[in-house]
């Protein structure tokens, strides 16, 4: 592919009010360095946990770090799809998105190193077939498909898989688990800081995915059916992953965690995404570009979690 023009040189310059560039600016303003997080006390807290508690936390971290690595590897075709559309703002944001995913991989690995975990961790995924289906099959297949087919429908399928299911349900539920483990017991302060930093980054990622689906649904109502169909395919798989994880620990899950609580939490996050996408139907596409409701939805989720967890800790 040769280049015939540069978007940053066009009349009027870049639209700094567009959501992708708002997210890009937000990421620059909130930059953080993994090496600045102090994991010293985490090692001491780790040694005090029971064997089952360490097993659960290791499995949870394993799922996170493998997921961050997967997206670091798989997100590039979405950048190419944005280039094919001539959407420089989205391409700029996705370069930051990919960098943040690599940084998340780094910081989870640093935490594992800090608490003394150095063995091969693949076995923690072997008992979770739903995880392997999502991260080793569904995710790479739908993202890599964009290399050959960058169509709006293919973009919606890819965004649903990653931004709405992996991040919008599973990662949020994982953060919820870390909060229940760490905040309510006042342990693992480094992990608490790690989750806070990553959660802030991924709210922007989810907002971009919602924005992308909304603009395609606004442009062509057939893409609403694509969104709805893909969500309905993957929500049961995401919930099955939660059930598989709890099934490994019998009637007494570590940290007194509740399977029903987690299933309800994850389902709520998934179902509420339908409304945000559906209200883009019939809207002017240009209006969607400067509509910040995707970011506001993620901030709402974060505020709700803060209030819920603060009440539980009181």
Swiss-Prot record:
The keyword Manganese applies. Fe cation binds at residues 101, 167, 202, 205. Signal peptide: none annotated. Disruption phenotype: Deletion of the gene does not have a major impact on sensitivity to frontline tuberculosis drugs such as rifampicin, isoniazid or ethambutol, and does not affect susceptibility to hydrogen peroxide. The deletion mutant survives equally well under nutrient starvation or in hypoxia and is not attenuated for growth in macrophages. One of its GO terms (molecular function) is iron ion binding. Its cofactor is Fe cation; Mn(2+). GO terms for biological process: deoxyribonucleotide biosynthetic process. Binds 1 Fe cation per subunit. Probable oxidase that might be involved in lipid metabolism. Is not essential for the survival of M.tuberculosis in stress conditions. Homodimer. This is R2-like ligand binding oxidase. It comes from Mycobacterium tuberculosis (strain ATCC 25618 / H37Rv). The lineage of its organism: Bacteria, Bacillati, Actinomycetota, Actinomycetes, Mycobacteriales.
């Amino acid at each position: 592919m040769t280049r015939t023009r540069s978007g940053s040189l066009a009349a009027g310059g870049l639209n700094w009010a567009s959501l992708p560039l708002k997210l890009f600016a937000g990421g620059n303003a909130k930059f953080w360095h993994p090496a600045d997080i102090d994991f010293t006390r985490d090692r001491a807290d780790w040694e005090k946990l029971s064997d089952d508690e360490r097993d659960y936390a290791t499995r949870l971290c394993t799922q996170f770090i493998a997921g961050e690595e997967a997206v670091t590897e798989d997100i590039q075709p979405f950048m190419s799809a944005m280039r094919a559309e001539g959407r420089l703002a989205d391409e700029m944001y996705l370069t930051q998105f990919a960098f943040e995913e690599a940084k998340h991989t780094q910081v989870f690995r640093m935490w594992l190193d800090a608490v003394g975990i150095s063995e091969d961790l693949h076995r923690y995924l072997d008992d979770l077939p739903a995880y392997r289906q999502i991260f080793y099959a569904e995710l790479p297949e739908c993202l890599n498909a964009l290399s050959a087919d960058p169509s709006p429908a293919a973009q919606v399928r890819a965004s649903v898989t990653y931004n709405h299911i992996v991040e919008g349900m599973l990662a949020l539920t994982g953060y919820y688990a870390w909060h229940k483990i760490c905040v309510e017991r006042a342990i693992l302060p480094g992990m608490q800081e790690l989750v806070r930093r990553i959660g802030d980054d991924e709210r922007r990622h989810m907002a971009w995915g919602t924005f992308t689906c909304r603009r395609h649904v606004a442009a062509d109502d057939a893409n609403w059916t694509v969104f709805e169909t893909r969500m309905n395919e993957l929500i049961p798989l995401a919930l099955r992953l939660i059930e598989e994880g709890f099934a490994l620990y019998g009637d007494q899950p570590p940290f007194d965690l509740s399977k029903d609580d987690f299933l309800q939490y994850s389902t709520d996050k998934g179902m509420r995404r339908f409304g945000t996408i559906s209200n883009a139907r019939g809207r002017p596409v240009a209006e969607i570009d400067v509509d910040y409701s995707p970011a506001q939805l993620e901030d709402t989720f974060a505020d709700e979690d803060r209030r819920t967890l603060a009440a539980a800790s009181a």
